[in-house]
From Swiss-Prot:
GO terms for molecular function: oxidoreductase activity, acting on iron-sulfur proteins as donors, NAD or NADP as acceptor. It comes from Aliivibrio fischeri (strain MJ11) (Vibrio fischeri). Its cofactor is FAD. Keywords: Cytoplasm, FAD, Flavoprotein, NAD, Oxidoreductase. This is Nitric oxide reductase FlRd-NAD(+) reductase. One of at least two accessory proteins for anaerobic nitric oxide (NO) reductase. Reduces the rubredoxin moiety of NO reductase. Pathway: Nitrogen metabolism; nitric oxide reduction. It catalyses: 2 reduced [nitric oxide reductase rubredoxin domain] + NAD(+) + H(+) = 2 oxidized [nitric oxide reductase rubredoxin domain] + NADH. Belongs to the FAD-dependent oxidoreductase family.
Length: 381
């Protein structure tokens, strides 16, 4: 009997890999181990569940059981993988030992919750999985005032979604502007204004210091001596790859699980994919690099070593009141910007020292120009 491909994790990366494998091979044995129900869903949709008034059940596209049947996999639901033995090519899960031919770590990431003072810290909510959405949905529905920690991609999307759902929202961000790791301040300012127009209180260059319980809700204090009285607090302060299993198995781990161009870790026959993987020194928690990684890894697992090649990729900021799209390098080592701003939005092009287009950002109605600029970017790079 052939030994199986074993995948730890049942998120987007894991299931995209399975779908890709099954397009060319319907028979090779695949086992999936997950500590949740294994339902198939699109995680980015979680940033918009409140304005759309969706329940956890409505986010699911296929139940775990239906997915397992449709894609011919053995799904080990609600199963905790305790350890990996790279030398023996085994994993231990719920006390049982399983042998693999190839092992894929698709363990995902978790939301970083900074260390705050106060007795309310344990009540800080996170929204990074269907399981977490199920756990916090009623608390969010019952809340009138919500504070979101972090004005990056997820935090900004979530704050606007909650505002569109009728909540009073405060967004606290340590940097001087929103999406600071993605674009300069002059581009994100209109997005900040769009948030404010929806009623979001945007508090920049400030950090949450303490979260304390009150008789009803919480008192949040910041480094700039602001105090907010809210019904709940959500952390969107970034994602941290889940690397504990890899670390305990003595795999090379830096920010994420370090992989080579074939997505293989420092151990033979063990690969990493998705939010947990560190590729060329970067953790790329976006759909397009995960899709491309899954396509390459599927070929490798089926016997054809395939190196991952990552082109320029488009990122969409899903803020419906002020949509943003960007690609290429838009945050570091920009020699000059060419910026056109009018009532339709912003079109900003980034150039290097050789006057080559290296990236762009378009906003609002200007997003219709994104694909033309994307083609130009790919032509010059």
């Amino acid at each position: 009997m052939n030994l199986p491909i074993v995948i730890i994790g049942s998120g987007f990366a894991s299931y995209q890999l399975i779908k890709t494998i099954r397009r060319t091979n319907s028979d090779c044995p695949i086992h999936v181990f997950t500590n949740d129900s294994g339902d198939d869903y699109n995680k980015p949709d979680l940033s918009h569940v409140f304005s759309k008034q969706q329940s956890p059940e409505e986010v699911v596209t296929l139940s775990g059981g239906d997915f397992a049947e449709q894609y011919n996999v053995i799904l080990h639901r609600h199963t905790l993988v305790e350890s990996i033995n790279p030398e023996q090519q085994t994993i231990t899960a719920n006390g049982e030992q399983y042998t693999y031919d190839k092992l894929v770590l698709a363990t995902g990431s978790h939301t970083f919750v900074p260390p705050f003072h106060g007795d309310g810290c344990e009540d800080i909510l996170t929204l990074n999985s269907l399981k977490e959405f199920s756990a916090i949905q009623q608390k969010i529905l019952d809340a009138k005032n919500i504070l979101v920690i972090g004005g990056g991609l997820i935090g900004t999307e979530l704050a606007m979604d909650l505002a569109n759902a009728g909540k009073m929202v405060t967004l606290v961000e340590p940097n001087s502007h929103l999406l600071a790791n993605m674009m300069p301040d002059f581009i994100s300012l209109p997005l900040e204004n769009a948030c404010k127009e929806k009623g979001v209180t945007v508090n920049l260059s400030d950090c949450v210091q303490a979260v304390n319980k009150q008789e009803q809700g919480y008192r949040v204090t910041t480094s700039n001596c602001h105090s907010y009285y809210v019904d709940c607090v959500i952390s969107a302060a970034g994602l941290k790859p889940n690397t504990q299993l890899a670390t305990e198995a003595n795999l090379m781990v830096n920010r994420g699980i370090v992989v080579d161009s074939n997505l293989q870790t420092s151990a033979n026959n063990i690969y990493a994919l998705g939010d947990c993987a560190e590729i060329e020194g970067k953790v790329m928690a976006y759909l397009q690099p995960i899709l491309l990684s899954a396509n390459a890894l599927a070929k490798t697992l089926l016997g054809t070593d395939t190196a991952l090649a990552l082109p320029n990729m488009m990122v969409k900021v899903k803020t419906p009141n002020y949509p943003v799209q960007l690609a290429g390098n838009t945050s570091t080592d920009i020699e000059r910007w060419s910026v056109d701003i009018d009532t339709q939005g912003v079109c900003a092009k980034a150039y290097d020292v050789n006057n080559q287009l290296t990236g762009f950002v378009v906003t609002n109605e200007r997003v219709k120009n994104a694909f033309t600029l994307f083609r130009e970017l790919n032509t010059t790079n």
